[in-house]
Swiss-Prot record:
It is found in: Secreted; Host nucleus; Host cytoplasm. Residues 73-92 are annotated as: Disordered. Secreted effector that partially suppresses the host cell death induced by cell death-inducing proteins. Keywords: Glycoprotein, Host cytoplasm, Host nucleus, Secreted, Signal, Virulence. The keyword Glycoprotein applies. Belongs to the RxLR effector family. Residues 1-16 form the signal peptide. Glycans are attached at residue 52. Its main location: secreted. One of its GO terms (cellular component) is extracellular region. This is Secreted RxLR effector protein 81. A motif (RxLR-dEER) lies at residues 88-91.
Length: 111
């Protein structure tokens, strides 16, 4: 089995990695406020936008706007259950802070 690792660190502190490009493992996107998982297929189909752009962070945000991406985000609440599922859609919130916001529907969020 070929074992390789992809790690991209963006200027705003967001990192993108995958344990193995040869398997069905999912990409993991980390920012200061969230951890996102999505399939390699959905990312690689538009990866050329990242490679060909001098401003990789902006290109990645454009990619996220174009694609519906499944992800997992950690959260907890003292008043509610520690774990719940919510359907959301990812939207980059701030390039400066590396934060991500969620909007609409399409992604499972779980504690």
């Amino acid at each position: 089995m070929l074992v390789s690792m992809l790690l991209i660190i963006f200027p705003n502190g967001v990192s993108l990695s995958t344990p193995s490009l040869s398997s069905r493992n999912k990409f993991i996107l980390r920012s200061r406020s969230s951890r996102l998982r999505f399939s390699a297929r959905s990312f690689l189909s538009s990866a050329s936008r990242l490679v060909n752009s001098s401003k990789m962070t902006l290109a990645f945000e454009r990619l996220l706007r174009l694609r519906r991406v499944s992800f997992t985000k950690k959260f907890s609440s003292s008043d509610e259950d520690k774990s719940r599922d919510v359907r959301r859609r990812l939207r980059p919130a701030s390039e400066a802070t590396g934060a991500f916001a969620v909007r609409g529907a399409d992604c499972a969020i779980a504690d």
